[in-house]
Amino acid sequence: ERDLLVAVTMDHELGHNLGIRHDTGSCSCGGYSCVMSPVISHDISKYFSDCSYIQCWDFIMKENPQCILNKHLRTDTVSTPVSGNELLEAGEECDCGTPGNPCCDAATCKLRPGAQCAEGLCCDQCRFKGAGKICRRARGDNPDDRCTGQSADCPRNRFHA
């Protein structure tokens, strides 16, 4: 039960980081107490309330948090390689889950001869898109993101407030 309490407390604090306030009496999660309850109950809940879902969605739509909305780079994940999981892992040049991919050898997870890339916002027909090509359109105050010509990945947004 202590582990559950720690996990729910972490969920609660993470909820605050996602714009979720403490629940009021009008909020419901189907249990006696919800994760964003202002007090800890002996009946520990693992569920967020209807109010929490609305507040989190509002936060994402209004604040446009890039750390949540940006697609991760394929090389961001460190794990045991698994073919076909759409992640580029240690020892793989490309994710070899799709035999029909013209850029990637499905048997070896290596790029086919002459290919620079197999997927990514800056990959087109097995080649890196040219430097300056738009890979992610502007959102709000953030400018367009552009390919570098050296990678298949669209660079992370460089705008800072």
From Swiss-Prot:
EC number annotated for this UniProt entry: 3.4.24.-
An example molecular function term from Gene Ontology annotations: toxin activity
Keyword Protease in record: yes
Amino acids binding Zn(2+): H12, H16, H22
Limits of the Peptidase M12B domain: 1-72
Active site: E13
Keywords annotated in UniProt: Cell adhesion impairing toxin, Disulfide bond, Hemostasis impairing toxin, Hydrolase, Metal-binding, Metalloprotease, Platelet aggregation inhibiting toxin, Protease, Secreted, Toxin, Zinc, Zymogen
Keyword Nucleotide-binding: no
UniProt-listed PROSITE patterns: ADAM_MEPRO (PS50215), DISINTEGRIN_1 (PS00427), DISINTEGRIN_2 (PS50214)
UniProt cross-references to Gene3D superfamilies, sorted A to Z: Collagenase (Catalytic Domain) (3.40.390.10), Disintegrin domain (4.10.70.10)
InterPro entries in alphabetical order: Disintegrin_CS, Disintegrin_dom, Disintegrin_dom_sf, MetalloPept_cat_dom_sf, Peptidase_M12B
Domain named Disintegrin: residues: 89-161
Function: Disintegrin: inhibit platelet aggregation induced by ADP, thrombin, platelet-activating factor and collagen. Acts by inhibiting fibrinogen interaction with platelet receptors GPIIb/GPIIIa (ITGA2B/ITGB3).
PANTHER family: ADAM A DISINTEGRIN AND METALLOPROTEASE DOMAIN (PTHR11905), DISINTEGRIN AND METALLOPROTEINASE DOMAIN-CONTAINING PROTEIN 28 (PTHR11905:SF32)
Record's subunit section: Monomer.
Protein name: Zinc metalloproteinase/disintegrin
Organism annotation: Bothrops jararaca (Jararaca)
Classification lineage: Eukaryota, Metazoa, Chordata, Craniata, Vertebrata
